[in-house]
Amino acid sequence: MFQRFKSAIDRTIAEEQARQQTATQSRSPSRTGSTSSRKGDGTPGQRVKSRKQASDAGDAPNPDPAVFEAAFVIDDSDEPSRAATPLPPNAADEKKSDNTNGQGNMPEDKTPEGQGANDEGSADKAQDGATDAPATKPQAPKLQEMSPEIRQKLRKLEKLEATYPELLRSYRVAHRRATAIEPFEKALRENTPLTSISDPEALVEYLNQVNLRSDMVMQELKKVSTDKDELQKKYNEAEEKAKKLEEELVAVRSASTDQPKTSDSETSKDAQDGKNGATSPEDPEKSKSPVSSVMGMFSPKHKPQKSLGEVAETKESNEEFFSYDDEIPQLQADVASKSEEIEKLKSEVEDLQKELTTARETSTGLVESLENATRELSKTRDVASVKDSLQAQLDDRNKEITSLNQRLEEVQKQLKQLEEDKNAHTAKVDELEVSLASSDKRTSELDAELAKASNAKNISKKLIDDLNNQIETLKNEKSDSQTKITDLTKKLESKPAPAMLTPAATPMPTVLQPAATSATAASGGGKKKNNKKKKGKGGVGGAVAPSQAPTAGDPVETPEPVITTDTAGNAELKAEIVKLKEEVAEKDTQIDRLSKRRKTEEDLREEIESLQENILMIGQDHVEAKDKIKELEAEKLELKTQITDLEKKISSSTSDAEASSKMQSEMESIKTEYSDLKEKTSTLQADLGAAQQLAQNRFKDLTELREVLQKAQPELKSLRQESATLKATKEELANKTKELRDMEKREKDLKRDVERAQKISSDRETEIKSLQEKLTVETNAKLRLEDAQRVSGRDLRRSEAEKVEISGRADKAEQELQSVQEELSKLRPKVKELEEQMHKLKREKAASQEEADFKTQQYSNAQGLLSSMRDQTAEMSVQLKESKSQAESLEEELAEVQRLLQERTREGETMRRLLADVDERADNKVRDMRARMEAAVEERDRIEDESATLARRKTRETEDLKQKLKDLEREVKTLTHERDELEQREKEWRKRREELESVEEKAEAETDELRTTASQLRTALDASEKQVRDVEKQRAELRRMLEESRQRYEKLSKDLKAAQTKLVASSSRSSFDSVRSGSNGSPAGAPDTVYLKTILLQFLEQKDTKLRAQLVPVLGKLLRFDKTDEQKWQKAVQHIEVK
């Protein structure tokens, strides 16, 4: 359309230019008279004005209008030749002056853009002739000499002078538009899917899509910016917390540097106090009752310096009656048992290290953040080595260090979360940009995401298997701990029941056995590691320290206060027993809760599998969520490595500090406290009664604990069975997912079949309409051909046969329509069934979501159990080191005992004989019972007094029981600590799960948005494809109708020719017959016109382009179109549709 408009404008402009050109060329002789007047009137102001006008008009991209006018020069017969009009010399001079001085008095729309002198001259001539027309009036004689034709043309030129600038301006505007359209269309083709400016609706749709994309991008950017601001706030808060922790660490360091000085002064004071206690027999501590001394042992305010000194005194006093060979076998047995436990723990640690090797590879980024913590731990370890003598201060420092480590771990976790969230949001922004840039490559990206989803599924399966393995290892460790507890209880049961105390007959000095010292040393070492856990622990930990015995001459002073203090001690012990029972009950409830959670593990796995399938089927754009899941898994592995490294470092530091402190304190205190041990033996004999009662109560508590553990074992077995059943259910879930995929494929096939059936039905309906139209056309043709059929019966039979065929086709079409409708009615219940299956799958998805949540909780519980077992391994290693240090101290004490025995043999022959008998009896009993250290004391006491030997035996047995009870109490407290840690970690994992749920909700919202956009695009594509298919079907139907109409036309033409030949042959008939035939033939033309009118009216009134296109072949039949004519009509119909 635009090209036609342009060509029309160009045509009119060319005609006008040709007229003006002829007029200017005819008026070229009159220029002589006008030059003089123009020469005088061309002022400089006017020249400047003409130049400005020329510069304004020269902005158009056209060539010079002079060139334009020269292009449209037309050779006219009325034009005078240039040779016949010679210029006079004045005119020639004026022409030269005009060319040299510039152009004056030019029209507004004339531009001197041409650089050639000849072109400018010709343009000046033409324009001067046009502008100086009024100046020719005074030259009347020259005008009279002109011919009337020239005058007429001049008058016409004067009329055209007003219209010429407007035409030139309109031409320039049109030319600008025509030249601007080409680069605009080129830019459209390069940057948009459009090809020309003839389709504004497509351009509007494209711009709307671009605006939608920009809006989506802006929304995502707003979300990301808000998330970024929140993360920045969290990061700043975490930095502030880290700074506060650093300041606290600096304060701790400064305090640790001040403490060694105070420790030296305190050790000197303690040594002086020990000497004074040895010299002054009337010390107030020595006058205390035996029960009060026992309660002092068990008190949490017990000082380590006193306990070590008293242990050394008991060792030296006991060494007077023991031999070195008697103690070695029992120590070897203890060392062998400890070594076996160490090997078991090492094997467990190796298994754990194998599981965490992969996690350590990913923890390289955390090394820098942990270096500060390790340096601080090393410094605190150095400080602990300096402060061996002050165990109480070291315990406080260990508490501070552990609290600081926990704070550091929390800060590091927060920092990791912030960094991971920041990375996730940056990844979101990048992925959004990539998705906007690569919208055309959506299909390839979707395939890649499917592969990623399958990889994520495999990773999740591996994580589940790892969790199961960890749970099994934890169960094995728990069973090992249970076996240990049962062994300890068996040992306690195998010990003989404590007998009643017999009064001491002889005033012989009695001493405590080395086992007591070892027990106290073990308790002191254990307190260093678990001081934070054992503040509420009573009675057994420091059994020897606070009680300072009276002199050897006063073994028993006041029996009545003993009874009162004994009852008070029993009450406190009962309170401790009640506390232990409550803790055991809490553990039982916790085990029940964990078992209930474990029972729903099968449902959780089903939910996880269904979620993964939903991610594969629907969430093809879940790349962000998968990256976040991977980051969380990496974070878990990093946290595991951090926990293991910190535990190892803490255990190594505490164990080294404890070992060194014990060795040094024992070596220094043995020499100074030997004399004090002799005096304390008498008070220890009185304390035996209270210790026996305490041992009985603790034995009962141990039996109750053993029953509780036996009850917990069947629950563990049930958990193992549930894990086995979970594997079977996992396989069943896989089969179900396959069946689901098959069902979805069937659903898609059924939908395709329904669409095909609908298309077939629509095609059949169009065929029926076309057949009906054909029936109407054929009925009209039948009316027209009735007269011809009267002449020829064959034509009538043929038409009837065609009518029967057409009716048969219509019946067939109706039958096919009915069959298609029946197929649709059959397919609808199938579609309903598939929709019900989809609802069921959605419900299963919700159930699987709940199962996944519960699975995360179980995973957090398993992590807590793992960490608690690691703590147990660290404590067992510490206990092993303590046992080694005890063995060394016992060896030294045995050497001291031998030396003392040799000195005592020199005192008298009677004592030598008694000691020889004691040694012989001791050798005999060592061969019989190597594991008992009481044999040597029994032989010595049989010589002195049978009552003394019984007392010493009981003291040994009580000390062993005390140590075992201490170990059991440690284990109970470790279990309570593990419970607290489990609760804390459960809270943390709940928080983490909530964060994950929020992230998943965001990801699901984003996927829903992407899904809606994808569905909209798909629906648009389906609609466009349907339109294309409909158009193609219509074209095929039209072609088929054309072919059928041609065939019918050929048949009819043949019949008409046959009828005409018959009419020519029957020319011998009468005029009446001819008149009748003419009258009968004349109405045949009348229906043709009426039918043509009705079809044209239908064609013009029809708004549907499809039906209008179907009427084209009917018109072609009536008007006898060719193929080219039909194509032209089809194009015209389509052009009307575009408009």
From Swiss-Prot:
Compositional bias ranges of the Basic and acidic residues kind: 7-18, 225-247, 261-273, 373-385, 475-494, 728-767, 786-815, 935-945, 977-1011
Any GO CC annotation of this UniProt entry: Golgi apparatus
PANTHER family for this protein: GRIP AND COILED-COIL DOMAIN-CONTAINING PROTEIN 1 (PTHR23157:SF25)
Membrane topology designation: Peripheral membrane protein
Protein's gene: ATG23
Subunit structure: Forms a complex with ATG9 and ATG27.
Basic residues: bias regions: 526-537
Coiled coil (residue ranges): 142-170, 215-259, 323-495, 566-1067
Described function: Required for cytoplasm to vacuole transport (Cvt) vesicle formation and efficient autophagy. Plays a role in ATG protein retrieval from the pre-autophagosomal structure (PAS) and is especially required for autophagy-dependent cycling of ATG9. Autophagy is required for proper vegetative growth, asexual/sexual reproduction, and full virulence. Autophagy is particularly involved in the biosynthesis of deoxynivalenol (DON), an important virulence determinant.
Subcellular location: Cytoplasm; Preautophagosomal structure membrane
Keywords assigned by UniProt, alphabetized: Autophagy, Coiled coil, Cytoplasm, Membrane, Protein transport, Transport
The protein, known as: Autophagy-related protein 23
Boundaries of every GRIP domain copy: 1082-1132
Chief location: cytoplasm
UniProt GO BP: autophagy; protein transport
SUPFAM superfamilies the UniProt entry points to: Myosin rod fragments
